[in-house]
Amino acid sequence: MAAEVLPSARWQYCGAPDGSQRAVLVQFSNGKLQSPGNMRFTLYENKDSTNPRKRNQRILAAETDRLSYVGNNFGTGALKCNTLCRHFVGILNKTSGQMEVYDAELFNMQPLFSDVSVESELALESQTKTYREKMDSCIEAFGTTKQKRALNTRRMNRVGNESLNRAVAKAAETIIDTKGVTALVSDAIHNDLQDDSLYLPPCYDDAAKPEDVYKFEDLLSPAEYEALQSPSEAFRNVTSEEILKMIEENSHCTFVIEALKSLPSDVESRDRQARCIWFLDTLIKFRAHRVVKRKSALGPGVPHIINTKLLKHFTCLTYNNGRLRNLISDSMKAKITAYVIILALHIHDFQIDLTVLQRDLKLSEKRMMEIAKAMRLKISKRRVSVAAGSEEDHKLGTLSLPLPPAQTSDRLAKRRKIT
């Protein structure tokens, strides 16, 4: 038996049936429709025809004797296939033999339970929602892609913060139950005592001599000390005329100039002092920077091993604008200050004028005293003659045994009083 030959038809694309509204295709989320004859459909359109995002929003309602259905082409219930692909409906005109093809849109119909209890529950939920929650619901239904992405990110962060807070609270309760409040307060005070000591070199409080409290080897290794021979030659052979020129040109700080004036005549001692003074002068100049933009921040005269030491021990590596850079943070400046004080103590037989150093480092007197006390120096006053025959009080710092007890800064003491 020969197969039946179907008549051919020509396609004719007609666009939307009424010029603006596409044909409606429906699918039911809870099954297949058995008897479509008793369905009553109503299509609702957004009245805002000027807004390009809202003018195509549609809601389709369907009613039967038993149940009502609703579907829409926007919001969370909309089908994504409407934006990813196009749907068409073909109607065969038997008279002309043409297949008229119209644009169509697919709606996912979901059952609507309009029970009184559900409506009252929704009304109550709407009343209890905050303004932020209502705005989030609007963004979820009508917001742009960017707004929805920001909403999802905020919700994820909120969940993460809540989980973190619960974990921290649980951990805190466990620690308090284990150690007790008294032990925790004692630990906090002990940590405060060590805050200002984090940037200090190792302190040997059981030393028998002042020079062993802060050992010179912790400041400069033998290789670093050897590398200072060449750059410190100018200081080692400095003359009175050159010192006067330094004063006139203001090329070096006051402490360095005063130290150069009192260099010992003994060759070995003079060499050691010159190297220490040069390194101290380098630290003070290095501290004046905020960001070190190149590897040789202080010029080609600084030995490579010293440059490496400065970048490694006195800067923080940070990432900014796609580039790594060496930053001299406030804590690193405090560390440099501590090293300068220790070098000055080794240069001046463990008694130094803190006021002169404070001015050279451009520090406040309060901050200088905080660091000096954290280093367990004994602070005293002395009248010093200045220009025009006048005198002023200077603070002296002395490293002597036995060491005084470690003192915290005023900021930490105030914080403990407040708590």
UniProtKB/Swiss-Prot annotation:
Protein modification: Acetylated at Lys-373 by CREBBP/CBP, leading to decreased RNA polymerase I transcription. In normal conditions, deacetylated by SIRT7, promoting the association of RNA polymerase I with the rDNA promoter region and coding region. In response to stress, SIRT7 is released from nucleoli leading to hyperacetylation of POLR1E/PAF53 and decreased association of RNA polymerase I with the rDNA promoter region.
Summary of the function given for this chain in its UniProt record: Component of RNA polymerase I (Pol I), a DNA-dependent RNA polymerase which synthesizes ribosomal RNA precursors using the four ribonucleoside triphosphates as substrates. Appears to be involved in the formation of the initiation complex at the promoter by mediating the interaction between Pol I and UBTF/UBF.
List of residues that carry N6-acetyllysine: 373
InterPro entries recorded: RNA_pol-assoc_fac_A49-like (IPR009668)
Pfam families xrefs: RNA_pol_I_A49
GO molecular function terms listed in the Swiss-Prot or TrEMBL record: DNA binding; RNA polymerase I general transcription initiation factor binding
Sorted UniProt keywords: Acetylation, DNA-directed RNA polymerase, Nucleus, Phosphoprotein, Transcription
Source species of the chain: Homo sapiens (Human)
Modified residues (Phosphoserine): 35, 163
Region Disordered, annotated ranges: 397-419
GO biological process terms, semicolon-separated: nucleolar large rRNA transcription by RNA polymerase I; RNA polymerase I preinitiation complex assembly; transcription elongation by RNA polymerase I; transcription initiation at RNA polymerase I promoter
Quaternary state and interactors: Component of the RNA polymerase I (Pol I) complex consisting of 13 subunits: a ten-subunit catalytic core composed of POLR1A/RPA1, POLR1B/RPA2, POLR1C/RPAC1, POLR1D/RPAC2, POLR1H/RPA12, POLR2E/RPABC1, POLR2F/RPABC2, POLR2H/RPABC3, POLR2K/RPABC4 and POLR2L/RPABC5; a mobile stalk subunit POLR1F/RPA43 protruding from the core and additional subunits homologous to general transcription factors POLR1E/RPA49 and POLR1G/RPA34. Forms a heterodimer with POLR1G/RPA34. Interacts with POLR1G. Also binds UBTF/UBF. Interacts with PWP1.
Name of the protein described by the UniProt record: DNA-directed RNA polymerase I subunit RPA49
Family, per entry: Belongs to the eukaryotic RPA49/POLR1E RNA polymerase subunit family.
CC per GO annotation: fibrillar center; nucleolus; nucleoplasm; RNA polymerase I complex
Transmembrane segments: none
Localization of this protein: Nucleus, Nucleolus
